[in-house]
Amino acid sequence: MSGYRLDKGGLLIDRAKEIAFRFDGKTHEGHAGDTLASALLASGQTLFGRSFKYHRPRGLYSAGPEEPNALVELRPGPHQVPNTRATMVELHDGLEANSQNRFPSLGFDLMAVNDRFSRFLSAGFYYKTFMGTGQPVWHFFEHFIRRAAGLGRARHDADPDRYEKTNAFTDVLIVGAGPAGLMAAKAAADAGKRVLVVDENAQAGGRLWDEGGEVDGLPTHEWARAAIADLEARGNVTLLLRTCVYGYYDDNILGASERVSEHKKTPDAFE
C-alpha cells in the first residue's frame, strides 16, 4: 500500500483485506470499506477531474454525495454508468473506473487550452459569436461546441440492467441515519410505530464514525454500533441503506432510489 494512508484510524475500513481496482487503466489497491475516492487518495492520486468549461484541474472537495469534482465513469461495456461520484463508490474486486471530460488523459488534457483563452470564452459567447452570423456558420461550429460540452458520455445501445419498483407503507419515515435519525427512529419504535429509516450511504451512523466525542457516555462510533444493532433487532424498524429519497409529493408520497448491486463484482441472481 502507499505511504499516503494513515497508519491508524478509519473505523469503516478493514486493513486486513486488500482490494485491487483500476482507475484510468492503472491498477491500484485499497481496503474493504474504502470508497473509490479514499482509495485513490491513499494511492497518491490528487487529480480527479477537469472543470466543465475551461478544463482546469480539480481535486476532491468533499467526502459524500455533495462532491462536485470527482465524477467518474464506472463499468465498461453496455453496463457503463457515467457521472458517478467517486466519494459514493464502494470499493470492490473488479472495480473499473475512468475519469471524464478530458482528452487524451486526465493528467494531460489538450482541452485545458481553453483556460488560456478564457477571456474570449465568456458565458454565452457562442450566441454572440456564431448565431448572429447566419445559420450556416452556426451549424458548422455547433458540432464542435456540443462535443466539447458535457461531462460523461452516455451510451446509445440498450440498457441491459433491470429496474424494479415496489411500494412501502410506514407510520414514520426517517430520511438520514445520522445521530438525529437514529435517535428519532428509536423514539418512534419505542412508541410502537412502524419505522422506515433511509440513508444514501452504505453505513448508518453519519458523522458518528468520523468525529470524536461521546454520546450517552460512549465514544460516538460505539454508540452508533449499539444504536444500529438495537434498531436492526426490532421487528417494527426497517433500515434501507444505499437509498436516496429524491422527492416529496402530494399525499405524503416520497420517492426513493436504492442502489442494489453497484457495490458488487457479481450481482446476485435477481439483482
Please describe what each predicted stretch is.
Residues 22, 160-169:
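Ferredoxin-like iron-sulfur electron-transfer modules
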Residues 166-196:
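N-terminal Rossmann-like FAD-binding beta1-loop-alpha1 element of flavoenzymes
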Residues 190-209:
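Glycine-rich FAD pyrophosphate-binding loop
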